Swiss-Prot record:
Taxonomy, superkingdom: Eukaryota
Protein name: Acyl-lipid omega-3 desaturase (cytochrome b5), endoplasmic reticulum
EC number: 1.14.19.25
Source organism per UniProt: Mortierella alpina
Transmembrane portions of the chain: 65-85, 88-108, 123-143, 202-222, 251-271, 275-295
Originating gene: MAW3
Length: 403
C-alpha cells in the first residue's frame, strides 16, 4: 500500500487533470469564430503603417550584417585563450550569440519574400535571394510555399505546414461521449493520464531536441511537418506538387543560390579546414534553424488555438489564430519582432516589419478577445505544447488540439 502522502498526491493530480479537462472543454464548447472582415480589421490600423521605406529596410540589413561581423571578429580571439576551460565556454557563448543574431537576416529575407521589404520587386528579390542563400534557404522556392501557408493558415485542408494530425490518422480509437457532458469520461481521463505519466520528460526533451536541430532542413528536403502529398515533396524539385509549372524557373534560381553558397563553404573549408568553417558558421547555422523551428512552432501550435474545416474557415479567422509571444527585449529586437507581432504579420504580410509592433496595438484593440498573446516562458511553452498538442478530432468544423 502506498504511503498516505503518495496517495494524496495522486488524488490531487487526478483532480487537477479533471479540472483542466473540464475547463478546456468549456472553452472549446463556448468558442465562437470571429466575424470581422479583413477590411474592418485593416481600417482599424492607420494607413501610414503600411508604407514601405526601402532605405529603412536596407539599414536594418546593414545593422544585422555589422553585428554578425563584430560577433565573428570577437570569436577570432577565442583560440588565443590560454586554457581549454576558457575556450569551451567562449565557443559556446559565440555559438549562442551568433546563432541568435543570424536569425535577423533570415527574417529580413522572409520579409523580402512577402514584398514587405521594398516597393520594388527587384530589390526584394536581390536582397531576399542573397540573404536566404547565405543561410542555405532556397529563397524563391520557400517564399512560394510560405505564401501558400499564409493563404491557408488555420485551415485543415488549405494550409501546407503545421497541420494537426487527426485522431484516426494517429490510429487512436474513437472518443466515446460521456453520459453527462460536464463529466470527464474514463477514456478521456485515461488519455490524459497516459500523457502525464507514460510520456516521460526525457522522451519529450529528446523529441524536441531532434525537431529543433533537424526539423527545418527536413522540412525543406522531405516536407517534414508539411501537408500530405501523393509523392515525395521537397523545395528543390522543379516538378514538386508545391509549385505550378510556370514557377519552375524560380526553383532553378533558388537552387543556384544554394549551390553558390555550398561552393563558398567548400572553398573556405579547403582554405581554412572543415572544422573551422563548422565552428564559425556550421554551429551558428544550426542555431538559426533551431530558432526558426521554435518561433514558427509556437506561433501556430497551442492548446487554446483552434483550426477550422472548410465550412468555418476564412482568411482572417486563420490569421487571427496565430499566437504572439515575447522572446525578451533583446531577442525581439534582433529578430525584428517576428515573435511578438506575428498575428499582425499574418493579417497583413506586406506591412513593413518595423511598423508591426505599433500596428499590433491597433489590431489588439480591434480584435479584443480574438487577439492571442501567450506569456508562458518559451521553454515551458515548447514543452507543454509538444506534450499537449497531439491531434484533433476527425469531426467538427472548429477543432482544438488534444492529447
Amino acid at each position: 500500500m502506498a504511503p498516505p502522502h503518495v496517495v494524496d498526491e495522486q488524488v490531487r493530480r487526478r483532480i487537477v487533470v479533471e479540472d483542466e479537462i473540464k475547463s478546456k472543454k468549456q472553452f472549446e464548447r463556448n468558442y465562437v469564430p470571429m466575424d470581422f472582415t479583413i477590411k474592418e480589421i485593416r481600417d482599424a490600423i492607420p494607413a501610414h503603417l503600411f508604407i514601405r521605406d526601402t532605405t529603412k529596410s536596407i539599414l536594418h540589413v546593414v545593422k544585422d550584417l555589422v553585428t554578425i561581423a563584430i560577433v565573428f571578429y570577437c570569436a577570432t580571439f577565442i583560440e588565443t585563450l590560454p586554457s581549454l576551460a576558457l575556450r569551451v565556454p567562449a565557443w559556446i557563448t559565440y555559438w549562442i550569440i551568433q546563432g541568435t543574431v543570424m536569425v535577423g537576416p533570415w527574417i529580413l529575407a522572409h520579409e523580402c519574400g512577402h514584398g514587405a521589404f521594398s516597393d520594388s520587386k527587384t530589390i526584394n528579390t536581390i536582397f531576399g535571394w542573397v540573404l536566404h542563400s547565405a543561410l542555405l534557404v532556397p529563397y524563391q522556392a520557400w517564399a512560394m510555399s510560405h505564401s501558400k501557408h499564409h493563404k491557408g493558415t488555420g485551415s485543415m485542408t488549405k494550409d501546407v505546414v503545421f497541420i494537426p494530425a487527426t485522431r484516426s490518422y494517429k490510429g487512436l480509437p474513437a472518443l466515446e461521449k460521456p453520459a453527462v457532458e460536464e463529466e470527464v469520461s474514463e477514456q478521456e481521463h485515461h488519455h490524459h493520464e497516459e500523457s502525464i505519466f507514460a510520456e516521460t520528460p526525457i522522451y519529450t526533451l529528446g523529441a524536441l531536441l531532434f525537431v529543433l536541430t533537424f526539423g527545418w532542413p527536413l522540412y525543406l528536403i522531405v516536407n517534414f511537418s508539411g501537408h500530405e502529398a501523393p509523392h515525395w515533396v521537397n523545395h528543390f524539385q522543379t516538378v514538386a506538387p508545391l509549385y505550378e509549372p510556370h514557377q519552375r524557373k524560380n526553383i532553378f534560381y533558388s537552387n543556384c543560390g544554394i549551390v553558390a553558397m555550398g561552393s563558398i563553404l567548400t572553398y573556405l573549408s579547403m582554405v581554412f579546414s572543415p572544422l573551422t568553417v563548422f565552428m564559425y558558421y556550421g554551429i551558428p547555422y544550426l542555431g538559426v534553424n533551431a530558432w526558426i523551428v521554435c518561433i514558427t512552432y509556437l506561433q501556430h501550435t497551442d492548446p487554446k488555438v483552434p483550426h477550422f474545416r472548410d465550412n468555418e474557415w476564412n482568411f482572417q479567422r486563420g490569421a487571427a489564430c496565430t499566437i504572439d509571444r515575447s522572446f525578451g527585449t533583446i531577442v525581439n529586437h534582433l529578430h525584428h519582432h517576428i515573435g511578438d507581432s506575428h498575428q499582425c504579420h499574418h493579417m497583413f504580410s506586406q506591412m513593413p516589419f518595423y511598423n508591426a509592433v505599433e500596428a499590433t496595438k491597433y489590431l489588439k484593440a480591434k480584435l479584443g478577445k480574438y487577439y492571442i498573446f501567450d506569456d508562458t516562458p518559451i521553454a515551458k511553452a515548447l514543452y507543454r505544447n509538444w506534450r499537449e498538442c497531439k491531434f484533433v478530432e476527425d469531426e467538427g468544423d472548429v477543432v482544438f488540439y488534444k492529447h
